[in-house]
């Protein structure tokens, strides 16, 4: 009986550990009854409350720089070039219905680029502000990482628009 109790407690602890990760559910056009593309995103971690951020659309002067802060800690990471035009974003979706969610899979701490400027949260919101399609968001994200470095540990991004869904 004692062994069963210990085994049960171990499974319970393993389940609790897994529940601290974010959860994404993605459905492509061919898998939904009405042809909709669906992305659901849940930040299952404690302390990640249901905040709904708004980034208004805008036109920016050539040469404008944008400050980047780590999404989790608020630490200043550096500056990037601002796009000439940015799009309206509410939560994790922009005015063109481009949607981005993420799931952290971590990784080895010694592999994190502490000199990088783009963390996972900044990648999401900057890409949403600069993209009209999911493919364009992927291009924006990969270009930003190539130019400015990636500050976070491992992430899986679910990126969708009304026509397709991708995992990056």
Describe every region a protein language model picked out.
Residues 128, 134, 152:
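Cysteine-dependent hydrolase recognition
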Residues 137:
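Extracellular glycan-modifying ectodomains
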Residues 22-120, 140-168:
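A contiguous strand-loop segment
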Residues 16-21:
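Sec/Tat signal peptide C-region and signal peptidase I cleavage site
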Residues 1-2:
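N-terminal secretory signal peptides that target proteins for export/translocation
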């Amino acid at each position: 009986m004692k062994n069963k109790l210990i085994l049960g407690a171990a499974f319970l602890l393993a389940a609790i550990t897994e529940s601290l990760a974010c959860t994404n559910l993605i459905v492509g056009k061919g898998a939904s009854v009405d042809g909709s593309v669906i992305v659901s995103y849940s930040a299952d971690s404690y302390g990640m409350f249901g905040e709904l951020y708004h980034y208004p659309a805008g036109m920016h002067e050539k040469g404008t720089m944008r400050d980047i802060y780590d999404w989790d800690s608020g630490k200043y990471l550096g500056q990037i070039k601002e796009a000439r035009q940015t799009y309206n974003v509410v939560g994790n979706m922009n005015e063109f219905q481009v949607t981005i969610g993420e799931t952290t899979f971590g990784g080895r701490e010694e592999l994190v680029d502490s000199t990088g400027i783009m963390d996972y949260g900044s990648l999401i919101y900057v890409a949403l502000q600069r993209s009209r399609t999911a493919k364009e968001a992927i291009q924006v994200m990969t270009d930003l990482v190539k130019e400015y470095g990636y500050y976070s540990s491992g992430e899986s991004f679910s990126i969708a628009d009304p026509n397709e869904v991708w995992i990056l």
